[in-house]
A protein has these predicted regions:
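Generic detection of long, well-ordered alpha-helical segments
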Residues: 1-4, 145, 149, 203-211
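A cross-family signal for N-terminal binding/gating loops and helix N-caps
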Residues: 1-116, 120-124, 266-270, 275-291
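Basic, nucleic-acid-binding surfaces and adjacent catalytic neighborhoods in DNA/RNA-processing proteins
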Residues: 22-39, 53, 78, 154-291
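Phosphate/anion-contacting hairpin/loop surfaces
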Residues: 68-190, 198
Length: 291
């Protein structure tokens, strides 16, 4: 799933390549991706792209006051195309959900981007709104961890008295906007905390170290992706992960085997030596199979 660093990098890429262009055409071969119908996609036609920003994991393309807001969900992606085919894509065929044609006002070639989604879950979501906060997910977002307002005291307030597992608090978008499954694993490994530890049980020292780890992991990922083309961001993310998606491989810190806990639609990874005093966490999916 694209998280804060990847969306931040896509924002930077689109600021460079899309701002100043004019929306020539919007095609929605995957009509299921469109979550709003007023204004319609045709309302974007003829509007100049004036800005691009991020709200948590949401990407917001501002077309002269009308906003194309995208949530890439777990398997969605934005693919920039320097030369879009003139023929309209077939409805409902393949991974393509939306295609946005962007004209060059200086007379250069037509470019644009495709919004695609792998798999069958169909969670890629696109909203066309006059105010980004009309998108329910944006309206509910918590604080951005890269914002100046996100301080160690703010984090302490989110965790204090919270009975949820610390992993759950970190990935709750109404608490902290933009941190997801992958980078929360990285943060917890960095600070040496079990993902299952109750958030309210963290000491002041734990909270201080967790705050620094959130900042370092996210800013480090953003810095590594700086200047990369959209097509290269996935590979960069994978290469920078030290525990997430590395089940069965040695921990880069201590050499122990990275373990996994599986859930219905996702999994987390951790190092027993670094995070759980050498004790493997119960894999709930395996436990259900053995019943």
């Amino acid at each position: 799933m694209p998280e804060l660093p990847e969306v931040e990098s896509l924002v930077a890429f689109l600021r460079e390549h899309a701002v100043g262009r004019v929306v020539a055409r919007v095609e929605t071969p995957g009509i299921h991706v469109l979550k709003t119908y007023d204004p319609p996609p045709s309302a974007l036609q003829g509007l100049a792209v004036t800005g691009v920003c991020r709200h948590g994991k949401f990407l917001d393309l501002d077309a002269t006051g009308l906003h194309l807001v995208v949530h890439l969900a777990r398997a969605g992606w934005l693919r920039w195309r320097a030369d879009l085919p003139p023929a309209a894509p077939k409805m409902g065929k393949g991974p393509l959900g939306m295609r946005v044609h962007l004209a060059d006002v200086t007379g250069g070639p037509m470019a644009g981007f495709d919004l695609t989604e792998a798999g069958t879950q169909k969670r890629l979501a696109v909203y066309i709104v006059r105010d980004p906060h009309d998108v329910p997910g944006i309206a509910r977002l918590g604080i951005d961890p890269l914002a100046p307002e996100f301080t160690v005291d703010v984090l302490a307030g989110l965790l204090a008295g919270n009975r949820s597992q610390v992993k759950g608090v970190l990935t709750d978008q109404t608490c902290i906007a933009g941190l997801g499954n992958a980078y929360s694993d990285e943060v917890l490994w960095e600070v040496g905390l079990s993902p299952f530890k109750p958030a309210g049980n963290l000491t002041a020292s734990d909270v201080a170290r967790l705050y620094l780890a959130i900042d370092e992991v996210l800013r480090g990922a953003v810095a590594r992706a700086e200047g990369l083309a959209a097509k290269d961001l996935k590979a960069e993310k994978k290469s920078g992960l030290r525990v997430h998606a590395r089940t069965g491989l040695p921990c880069p810190r201590c050499g122990d085997t990275v373990r996994e806990v599986s859930f219905a639609a996702k999994s987390l990874q951790y190092c027993p030596t670094c995070q759980t005093d050498g004790k493997p966490l119960a894999d709930r999916r395996l436990s259900r199979l053995l019943k």
